[in-house]
Amino acid sequence: AIGADAYERLRASDGEAVSQHSRAAFPGYLLIASFLPIIMWNGVRSWPTAIGMFALAMLMAVAAWDLTRRPHKSVGYMVGYAIGNALLIAIISRFSGPLLVVPAVFAFVTGSVVTYPTFVTRKWLLMGIMLAGFLAPIALEELGVLARTWTMTDAGVLTFGDGMELSGTPTVVTVIFASLATIVMAGLQSARVSSASRAAHHRLVLQAHQLRQLGGHVVRVQQRHREA
């Protein structure tokens, strides 16, 4: 068991980690919301899907900002946050199919959200939520509940989307931009996690060094007392 003071210090450390992490995630949701004009440039096939993506991205941005200000949330809140992420990416799959950019986005978001303290000890819960978000649209398409966004042909995988038109230069630009955005956001988030881990490791090394110095000083003082 640890004392109350140590517990509060650990809790504060977790809160700081959540704040930093959600602050890094905030621009990503705004970036997703900014795709609405790009979707309109391609040609909207489903306004409810387009508006739903924009609205949910903005809602997730608000949730991320709230986490930066009040990081100590319940498990239920964080599960809702994870479900919101999975649902947002599932909606994104309606624009270009689930096999083009979406798997990379799911991998990036899962790797990002799992670093929250709530999911460090509940990784399988998070992975279950994310896998459900990836597989649900595919299953619903197979059942005929949702319009198909892809099919397999002799030439390979044919993606045609349901939320926007997929043809011509706008679509090429959109796919490239979405891929670049995913790579950049993943790189920035990984750099943030690595930087935080490196800083924590350095603090431990310095503290261990200081303790060794203190221990050596105590030993020398004790030896002087014995010699005296």
Labelled PLM ranges:
Residues 1-5, 62-67, 173-212:
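Juxtamembrane or sensor-core-proximal signal-transducing alpha helices
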Residues 1-16:
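Short, Lys/Arg-rich, polar N-terminal cytosolic tail immediately upstream
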Residues 21-28, 163-189:
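Extracellular-loop-to-transmembrane junctions of the mid-late helices
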Residues 21-113, 127-139:
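Hydrophobic transmembrane alpha-helices and their membrane-interface boundaries in multi-pass
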Residues 47, 71-72, 144, 148, ...:
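Membrane-interfacial segments
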Residues 135-149:
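C-terminal TM-helix exit segments that contain a strictly Trp-centered aromatic cap at the helix terminus
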Residues 145-167:
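Membrane-interfacial helical/loop segments at transmembrane boundaries in membrane proteins
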Residues 212-228:
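PAS/LOV and related PAS-like sensory modules
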